[in-house]
A protein has these predicted regions:
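Conserved phosphate- and dinucleotide-binding cores of soluble alpha/beta proteins
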Residues: 2-42, 47, 51, 62, ...
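HTH-adjacent hinge/linker in prokaryotic transcriptional regulators
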Residues: 2-116, 124-136, 148-152
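Short glycine/serine/threonine-rich phosphate/pyrophosphate-binding segments
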Residues: 119-123, 227-230
Length: 276
């Protein structure tokens, strides 16, 4: 991987200055190889001004892709946030129930936005298995690839690629999403409480917000282990949702807040029965 990065830099240096999006993608690659990068070193490598690189790092930090540090940046600490592979291995039975029930609600001919996440990957699998002829816009590579084996027409967003999440985020992703209006969006989240829906990674929170803005019907797929939890970035208030599909009915303040906000709660029971 280090050799590939070196070859990439050498090739781009011969061709001249690279595009902003390519430069930022390369910065993310550098942080996969090294725990810390300095602005002065990046400026030398990319033959760009330190002010340009400072703006790059500020933008990546704003999207939650890196941690800003004095004179440079470091890879974001992910000890508190499991990778996509780790999340896929956890609570798989509950996640499949949620995804299967959500997939059953999708109709042929619908236009849908689906975000990245372990549960939405399972949703894509069930949609492909059913052969639903919908049109899907997604920022998730696994979702796009899975639906590509079915009857769906798929558009994959551009943006900054996150290898651990197999997804794209950033300004280009948001600009792409802003061009469309869809029948429904289906998103996941890191947490849901009476304060609203939240996400640990700010870049993902921004994508979810834009998808919610662009949809007539807004659905959240969330496991009961995330009830009462608040992530770093707010995605929406509860009244920004139409439906929550989950594996267990919430109680207490969360249930009261959802009811007050008029959110439909659909529970995927172990037997496969639906409870509203």
């Amino acid at each position: 991987m280090a050799e590939a990065a070196a070859q990439y830099r050498h090739k781009e240096k011969r061709r001249g200055r690279i595009k902003k999006s390519e430069r930022r993608a390369q910065i993310l690659l550098e942080l996969k190889l090294h725990p810390h990068v300095r602005i002065s070193e990046l400026a030398r490598r990319f033959d760009a001004s330190t002010e340009t690189l400072r703006r790059d790092l500020d933008a990546l930090a704003k999207d939650g892709l890196i941690d800003r540090a004095h004179g440079g940046a470091s890879a974001p600490s992910q000890g508190h946030y499991p990778t996509l592979d780790q999340r896929n291995a956890a609570r798989s039975e509950e996640r499949e129930r949620i995804a299967q029930l959500a997939a059953a609600q999708v109709r042929d001919g619908e236009t849908i936005m689906i975000d990245s996440g372990s549960t939405t990957i399972q949703l894509a699998r069930f949609l492909a298995y059913r052969g639903v002829t919908c049109k899907v816009i997604t920022n998730s590579l696994p979702v796009a690839m899975t639906l590509g084996h079915g009857a769906a027409e798929v558009m994959l967003c551009p943006g900054e690629y996150l290898p651990d999440e197999s997804a794209v985020v950033g300004p280009e992703t948001l600009e792409f999403l802003s061009q469309f209006h869809v029948d429904r969006c289906i998103i996941g989240a890191s947490g849901i409480s009476d304060e609203g829906v939240s996400e640990t990674v700010r870049g993902f929170a921004a994508v979810k917000k834009e998808m919610l803005r662009r949809a007539s019907r807004r659905q959240l797929l969330v496991g009961s282990e995330k009830f009462g939890k608040d992530g770093l970035a707010r995605v929406t208030r509860l009244d920004g949702l139409d439906t929550v599909v989950t594996d267990a009915r919430p109680d207490g303040s969360l249930l009261r807040a959802l009811s007050k906000s008029g959110v439909e709660i659909v529970v995927a029971e172990p037997s496969g029965d639906q409870k509203a």
